[in-house]
Swiss-Prot record:
It comes from the Bacteria. Keywords: Cytoplasm, Endonuclease, Hydrolase, Magnesium, Metal-binding, mRNA processing, Nuclease, RNA-binding, rRNA processing, rRNA-binding, tRNA processing. InterPro entries: dsRBD_dom, RNase_III, RNase_III_dom, RNase_III_sf. GO terms for molecular function: double-stranded RNA binding; metal ion binding; ribonuclease III activity; rRNA binding. Belongs to the ribonuclease III family. The gene is rnc. It is found in: Cytoplasm. Mg(2+) binds at E40, D113, E116. Residues 5-127 form the RNase III domain. The active site is at D44, E116. This is Ribonuclease 3. Its EC number is 3.1.26.3.
C-alpha cells in the first residue's frame, strides 16, 4: 500500500482489504486497461438505495414524489463532487495523459463517478453494511440540511436537477405552435431530453407556463413523479 492511498483511506474512513479494488475505483476510462465504470454502476445503485432509505426514515410524512426530488438533490453530481473534493480525491485518480492535461482531476463528473465507484468497491470488499455505513456517514450533514421545503420547486427546476444528478444533458424546450388571438393566446411547447424517446408536451397561456407543463409531463414519463404529488 502506498502512503498516498493510506492517506485517502483515512479521509474516506475505510481501509480496504483488497487494495486492487480501491485502485480500480480510482481508474478513469481514459487510463489504459481496466477502468472504474462497472464499479461506478454498482456504486450508483447502492448510493440511490442508501439515500432513499435514509430519506424514507427522516421524512415519514413525505410523499413519493417529494422523496424522489430530495434524493435527486442528494445524489446529484454536484453534491458528490463536493464530497470528493473534501476527500482530496482528484490527486489520487488514474487518468490518461490527455485527460490529465485538460484538468480531468478537477472535473465534477469524473470526481462524482469515482466516488460512486469507491462505494461499489467498498461493497465488494466488505458487503452492504460497510458500504451503507460509509455512505450514510458521508451524507449525514447533507441529509440533515434538507427539508420538505426543498421539494416546493417548479417542474422545470426539478427536471433539471434530476437530469444533472444523472449526468445528462439539460432539457431543450421549443415552442411548436401559438394559437388564438393576441389577447388570449395559447402556447404549445415540446420538451426534449435524451432519456426519453418521445418529446413531452405542454400548453399554457404563456410560454413559461407551457414549458412548466411539458417539464411536469417529462418527470411523469421518466417515472420520477406520478402526477399526484
Amino acid at each position: 500500500m502506498t502512503v498516498s492511498l493510506a492517506r485517502l483511506e483515512r479521509q474516506l474512513g475505510y481501509t480496504f482489504k483488497d487494495q486492487e479494488l480501491m485502485v480500480l475505483a480510482l481508474t478513469h476510462r481514459s487510463f489504459a486497461g481496466r477502468n472504474n465504470e462497472r464499479l461506478e454502476f454498482l456504486g450508483d445503485a447502492i448510493l440511490n438505495f442508501v439515500a432513499g432509505e435514509a430519506l424514507f426514515e427522516r421524512f415519514p410524512q413525505a410523499r413519493e414524489g417529494q422523496l424522489s426530488r430530495l434524493r435527486a438533490r442528494l445524489v446529484k453530481g454536484e453534491t458528490l463532487a463536493v464530497l470528493a473534493r473534501g476527500f482530496g480525491l482528484g490527486e489520487y485518480l488514474r487518468l490518461g495523459s490527455g485527460e490529465l492535461k485538460s484538468g480531468g482531476f478537477r472535473r465534477e463528473s469524473i470526481l462524482a463517478d469515482a466516488l460512486e465507484a469507491l462505494i461499489g468497491a467498498i461493497y465488494l470488499d466488505a458487503g452492504m453494511e460497510a458500504a451503507k455505513e460509509r455512505v450514510t456517514a458521508w451524507l449525514t450533514s447533507e441529509i440533515e440540511s434538507l427539508t420538505l421545503v426543498d421539494t416546493n420547486k417548479d417542474p422545470k427546476t426539478r427536471l433539471q436537477e434530476f437530469l444533472q444528478s444523472r449526468g445528462c444533458e439539460l432539457p431543450r424546450y421549443e415552442v411548436v405552435d401559438i394559437q388564438g388571438e393576441p389577447h388570449c393566446r395559447v402556447f404549445f411547447v415540446e420538451c426534449e431530453i435524451t432519456l426519453l424517446n418521445e418529446k413531452s408536451r405542454g400548453q399554457g397561456v404563456s410560454r413559461r407556463i407551457a414549458e412548466q407543463v411539458a417539464a411536469a409531463a417529462a418527470l411523469i414519463a421518466l417515472g420520477v413523479e406520478n402526477g399526484h404529488d
